[in-house]
């Protein structure tokens, strides 16, 4: 009988330990996806801007003209930026790898400026933004193919940390 009681206590302890282990695994505070999802759901956060609004617009080859898709994204950016006016931000202009470094720096600058001008036309204060061109120096995709080049022809709106 004594052995049965010890066995029963051991089983209760094992069941309790297993339940605690399952509960601990269900909520991992070090899970980067959990932190990102929590941040993404916070209205007005930088993650909210990237995930729900979109932080970049794309351009045709050798062009700084905003197409209809870019204007639609910038309209959403303008609405968000006007609502959360405490953010200052930088517009980065980028180009694909084709062309000289100097040409692509100038093209990236025109893309950033076109993006800036459009946001200003939608009521966003020009005092909150600055532009910079990286030309072809910071590609997001590296390969000798149109699929990579099209991803690199972009302007990215980057919110400054901590707001304005």
Predicted segments, located by residue:
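Short, solvent-exposed beta-strand edge segments and adjacent coil->beta transition regions
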Residues: 54-56, 102, 154
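Periplasmic peptidoglycan-binding/tethering modules of Gram-negative envelope proteins
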Residues: 26-88, 161-164
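Bacterial N-terminal signal peptides that target proteins for export
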Residues: 2-15
